[in-house]
Amino acid sequence: PERVNETEGRDRIRALDADAWVVIAFGQKLGRRLLEDRFAINLHASLLPRWRGAAPINAAMVAGDTETGNSVITLAEEMDAGLVLGQSRRAIEPRYTAGELHDLLAEDGPELMLRVLGQHVGGTLEAEAQDESRVTLASKMSKADGWIDFAQSAEACRARVHGLTPWPGVGIELGDTMLKLRRVAAEAGHGSAKPGAVLDADGLIACGEGALRLLEVQPAGKKPMAFSAFANGREIAIGSIARSERPPC
C-alpha cells in the first residue's frame, strides 16, 4: 500500500496475518496501531545506538569511524530506537566509498536477518535495549552537504569525500573548472602550505595536516575519470587554491 498507516493500507497488511514482519529500507514509519501484537523487525545499516536516522552509512564514514555494520531491531514508536536483536560488523576500509560500503552491508544483511528469524522461531532470541547515552544521529543528506574544508586534516577530508560519494558528492573549484571529487587518498607530510593550495600537477592539495591526492574526479556535465585523464593537456597551476564553499546556514 502507498500509505500503510491509513485504514485501507493497515487493513490490507494485517489481513496477511504474517508470523513476522520484516522492514528493510522502507520510507514510511509504521504506526502503533499497525504494530500491535506483531513481531515486526527492521534492518538498519549501523551499529545501533550509533547513527540512528536516514543516512547512517554516510554519517559513519564522514565521522571517520573505522567500523560499522547492520542491526536488526524491533520496530518502535521512536525512529530506530527498538530493542537490538542482532548485529553484524564490517570494517570501513579507507578505499571504500559510501556507495561501495552500502553494497557490502546489503550483502551482509540477509544472513543477519535470517539468523534473527531462526532464533525467533527456535525460542532462543535475546533482545537488548539501546544505551540512550550513546545515541548519535545521522541526518538526511542533501546537496548542501557537498563541500569540503581543506583546513581539516587530509584524513578528515578523505573521509568526507568517500563518505559523500556517490551522493551528494563533494564539489571543488579547481582553476576555472568545477569538479566532483570521487576518490582520493590522504598523504602525510608536505610542509605547511596554505590549505587548498595545489602542490603538484598530479592533483595533490594541501590540507591543515597532510595533503589530499585526487585520484578520480568528475567535471561538471561529464563522466567520472582518473585525475590523470582530467589533467592531460591542461595546465594545473601549482600554488593556485582549490576552493569549496560551505553554504550559509
Model-assigned labels for residue ranges:
Residues 1-166, 210-213, 219-221, 238-249:
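One-carbon transfer enzymes
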Residues 158-249:
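C-terminal active-site/capping subdomain that shapes the small-molecule cofactor and substrate pocket
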